[in-house]
Amino acid sequence: MWRFLRCPAIFRGDLHHFRGIQSGFLLFLLFACAIPPFTGCGTNFQQKTGQELRSASAVGNLIHVPLTRQSSDYTCGVAVLQSILYFHDAQDDYSEETLVKELKADPVNGTSYQTMADFARSKGYLVDIRTGMTLNDIRNFIDNGIPVIVLIQAWAESLVDYSQDWEDGHYAVAIGYDRDTVYFMDPSTMGNYTYLPIREFLDRWHDEDKGVKLDRFGMIIQREKRENHYDPDNIFRIR
């Protein structure tokens, strides 16, 4: 299905007035007015404006986890787990393709947090799954250098009241905070960290899985020993 933008006035009248236009050019303009819709888990991109941008260097408490990018509208869970595993152990360099298969992610059901937890545990990680978390819980984990996977409502195809929305669940990683903001690694956003004002984050911090409400959900994945911890300052030689 295609969503159509408003096209020039030339196409809002009767096309028989424009028989002189070559058919190839006409088709080009028609398709130029069409864009594919983006739905689901965090691929509905919105253009950033100067007012929306902030500098990571100005955030006093920020964990620099690897930036990962989901390749489809149902693999946000895959991408956040990929980031977290590599963050804790740089030898756990799993490709998205591998994790999609291991986690059995699919377009209908997305990625199950329970499957994510089971996979992490099978690799020797400690996993703590919580609901009913508080903002202070998030802050305390971040203060100790531990990012938190959260489920929020985000990237809806149309304007919605996220406090009442349960249909646009999205995985992100809470990695930082300041007085009025929470910062994230959001796999729907290429190359940059993201943020939400605290009040808005709290309104969005919920989801539903197979009929079960997940309010203030958080998943904490840790290594008992962090010998190969990810360091964004490292630059590797190509082999």
Regions found by a protein language model. Name each.
Residues G77-L85, E96-V100, Y113-A117, L135, ...:
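Extracytoplasmic/secreted envelope proteins and their assembly/folding machinery
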Residues G42-G50, W166, I175-R239:
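Noncatalytic regulatory segments and standalone regulatory/sensor domains
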Residues G24-P37:
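Bacterial N-terminal signal peptides
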Residues P37-G110, A154, Y162, D178, ...:
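Active-site-adjacent structural segments surrounding the nucleophilic cysteine of cysteine proteases
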Residues T131-P187, Y193-T194:
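Active-site-adjacent substructure of cysteine-protease-like catalytic cores
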Residues F4-L26:
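Bacterial N-terminal signal peptides that target proteins for export
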Residues S83-Q91, E102-D106, F119-L126, N140-G145, ...:
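Structured segments of extracytoplasmic/periplasmic soluble domains
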